[in-house]
Design a protein with these regions (language model features):
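Conserved catalytic core of nucleotide-sugar-dependent glycosyltransferases
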Residues: 141, 160-236
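Active-site beta-to-alpha loop of glycosyltransferases that engages the nucleotide-sugar donor
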Residues: 69-81, 91
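Hydrophobic targeting segments
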Residues: 63-69, 86, 94-100, 247
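Residues at the starts of beta-strands that form the adenosine-phosphate
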Residues: 94-95, 149, 260
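Short beta-strand-to-loop acidic/aromatic patch adjacent to the donor-nucleotide binding site
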Residues: 148-158
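Short, acidic, metal-binding catalytic loop of nucleotide-sugar glycosyltransferases
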Residues: 82-94, 117
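Active-site-proximal specificity loops/subdomain of glycosyltransferases
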Residues: 101-147
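C-terminal catalytic/acceptor-binding lobe
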Residues: 2-46, 237-314
Length: 314
């Protein structure tokens, strides 16, 4: 059921220029998105008692696969849809952790009931003191589970059933790399200068070990244990340089640590959750050129402090 909607949504491509100009494809995407956002929640509720849609008790103490996600009040009400899609994977992670801030969710009762119900099926919900925005998704898992591998997801996406399998399989074949399902190819001019973010092209096919892929954490990325530069846990520095772009920070950290990125299959088969009043960091970063501003800040800091540009052409 999930894969059907993901495939239908992914199949809508802007092939005809005229139809693109009259926004036919945009309208079609809206219709499909509305349909899926009606059908899938009903499907999830009707099948929630299936014993295969839960996590088993884990026995390993390190080397686990942990799916990590965060959310905020405007989206928390539908986060359960994202988590249902993760519970229905072909291969399941060892742990799924939701990191929330007490600044936004001061009590257990402030967490939606549907989300709290998922604890009985293995979901872990952690209330932490401070709100580090989207940086919560990696900061706390690195603090508490440093010897484990983690997969980042977003709270506004329903993931296809092969999502975790493709990332884990990519990691097994490339154990020294970070693995992603969604990335952009960074562009440089003839002199090796990094071009603006809006000129980068989306990666539409698999890429073997590469230095030019800028991964997106929301589309799904697997970070092996110890794959990131030690500064990754310096949350004050991260927030001062790129508060609204955990993607920028994590890409810088993997590059400073000498890691390459592998982009695996099926990059577009995700299904967006519909929110009536949505706020997207990706929209803010793209439309206001904030990605360029934050990338520039990160480059400047590391050039001045360690003499290395994390986004230099290699």
């Amino acid at each position: 059921m999930i894969d059907f909607w993901c495939c239908v949504y992914a199949s809508i491509l802007d092939k005809n220029l005229f139809l693109k100009r009259i926004r036919f494809y945009s309208l079609l995407r809206v219709i499909v998105r509305l349909g899926g956002n009606i059908v899938l929640p009903l499907y999830f509720q009707l099948t929630a008692k299936n014993n295969s849609y839960r996590l088993s008790a884990f026995s390993k103490e390190q080397g686990r696969i942990i799916v990590t996600v965060t959310s905020f009040p405007k989206r928390i009400g539908r986060l359960w849809l994202t988590l249902e899609s993760i519970l229905r994977q072909k291969i399941k992670p060892d742990m799924i952790i939701v990191w929330l801030s007490k600044e936004q969710f001061p009590t257990e009762e402030s967490i939606p009931f549907k989300l709290r119900q998922l604890r009985s099926r293995g979901i872990i919900i952690r209330l932490e003191e401070y709100d580090f925005a989207s940086h919560k998704k990696y900061y706390y898992v690195l603090r508490d589970y440093r010897e484990d591998h983690f997969i980042t997801i977003d709270d506004d996406i329903i993931y296809p059933s092969d999502f975790i399998f493709s990332l884990v399989n990519g990691y097994k074949q490339n154990p020294n790399c970070v693995v992603s399902r969604y990335a952009f190819e960074m562009k440089y001019d003839l002199n090796g200068n990094l071009l603006p973010y809006m000129t980068w092209s989306m990666v539409r096919k698999e890429m073997e070990q590469t230095d030019v892929a800028f991964l997106g954490t929301g589309g799904g990325a697997l970070f092996p244990a110890h794959s990131l530069y030690p500064d990754v846990s310096n949350i004050e520095l991260a927030l001062s340089l790129c508060k609204y772009a955990d993607d920028v920070w994590l890409n810088a950290m993997l590059r400073l640590n000498g890691k390459k990125v592998v982009v695996v299959d099926n990059l577009f088969s995700i299904f967006p959750i519909l929110y009536l009043k949505d706020f997207s960091l990706s929209s803010l970063n793209c439309h206001q050129n904030m990605n360029d501003v934050q990338i520039k800040a990160v480059r400047k800091y590391y050039e001045e402090n360690i003499g290395q540009d994390p986004f230099a052409k290699i």
